[in-house]
Amino acid sequence: MKAIKNKGQDKTMNETTHRFARLVDLSAVQATSTEADVRACAELAARYNIISVHVLPCWTRFLSTLLPQQGTGEVMIGGPVGFPGGGHTTDTKVQEVRQLIADGAREVDMVVNIGKVLSGDYDYVREDLRRVVEAAAPVPAKVILETHYLNEEQIRRVCEIAVEVGMKWVKTSTGWAPTGATVEKVRIIADQLKGRIDIKGAGGIRDLATVRALYQLGVRRFGMSHGAVTKVLAELEQHPERFPELNAD
């Protein structure tokens, strides 16, 4: 399998486009994601030096053959754990983490046990998250809240648990629920976290206006599809001034 060469930052790329690319988790995590989709994501990521590509676990090892060089300044591989419903046992999630890392993942995004959150069983949720963090270390872990199904109190509780157990990121959504990274839910997350750990927005992020709105709330990683990322990159290549916040930071 021929690897896709990562040439680093394209010399023709403006600084705004480059900075945006380093905020993107390029994702092919739908049930219908194919080998061609994974390859297309790898090619786009290598071209723009996108920070990471996330695929379903069955594609992780294949993706690692396309993106063999990882580390600072390179394209990382990420993978989901307990995806998409979060209802896997903790032991299963731990095994998934170990397999993903063995296959080349350098980030893991774990779905919280939504049913346990809705049931108010926060002791279970805490231990579930803690063991995934422990299994992943030193690979950073994100917890996916699937905010569509949670109310404000539940979002705040899980955010606090995430901080307590050492999660590096709180992520809004899987992209499988009816809604994803809404301004309303991201505002709650940002207010609760207060910068202690980072925020990833995912689900329904399809244009620059949405990216900017979420960035202004503190989102610093964007889970987006190949089509959405391509659209935003093309706009920023022509109009870098449309994302002034990125150049101000």
Curated annotation (Swiss-Prot):
<comment type="pathway">
    <text>Carbohydrate degradation; 2-deoxy-D-ribose 1-phosphate degradation; D-glyceraldehyde 3-phosphate and acetaldehyde from 2-deoxy-alpha-D-ribose 1-phosphate: step 2/2.</text>
</comment>
<protein>
    <recommendedName>
        <fullName>Deoxyribose-phosphate aldolase</fullName>
        <ecNumber>4.1.2.4</ecNumber>
    </recommendedName>
</protein>
<dbReference type="GO" id="GO:0016052">
    <property type="term" value="P:carbohydrate catabolic process"/>
</dbReference>
<feature type="active site" description="Proton donor/acceptor">
    <location>
        <position position="200"/>
    </location>
</feature>
<dbReference type="Pfam" id="PF01791">
    <property type="entry name" value="DeoC"/>
</dbReference>
<dbReference type="InterPro" id="IPR013785">
    <property type="entry name" value="Aldolase_TIM"/>
</dbReference>
<dbReference type="GO" id="GO:0006018">
    <property type="term" value="P:2-deoxyribose 1-phosphate catabolic process"/>
</dbReference>
<dbReference type="InterPro" id="IPR028581">
    <property type="entry name" value="DeoC_typeI"/>
</dbReference>
<dbReference type="GO" id="GO:0004139">
    <property type="term" value="F:deoxyribose-phosphate aldolase activity"/>
</dbReference>
<comment type="similarity">
    <text>Belongs to the DeoC/FbaB aldolase family. DeoC type 1 subfamily.</text>
</comment>
<keyword id="KW-0704">Schiff base</keyword>
<keyword id="KW-0456">Lyase</keyword>
<dbReference type="GO" id="GO:0009264">
    <property type="term" value="P:deoxyribonucleotide catabolic process"/>
</dbReference>
<dbReference type="InterPro" id="IPR011343">
    <property type="entry name" value="DeoC"/>
</dbReference>
<comment type="function">
    <text>Catalyzes a reversible aldol reaction between acetaldehyde and D-glyceraldehyde 3-phosphate to generate 2-deoxy-D-ribose 5-phosphate.</text>
</comment>
<dbReference type="InterPro" id="IPR002915">
    <property type="entry name" value="DeoC/FbaB/LacD_aldolase"/>
</dbReference>
<dbReference type="GO" id="GO:0005737">
    <property type="term" value="C:cytoplasm"/>
</dbReference>
<feature type="active site" description="Proton donor/acceptor">
    <location>
        <position position="109"/>
    </location>
</feature>
<keyword id="KW-0963">Cytoplasm</keyword>
<feature type="active site" description="Schiff-base intermediate with acetaldehyde">
    <location>
        <position position="171"/>
    </location>
</feature>
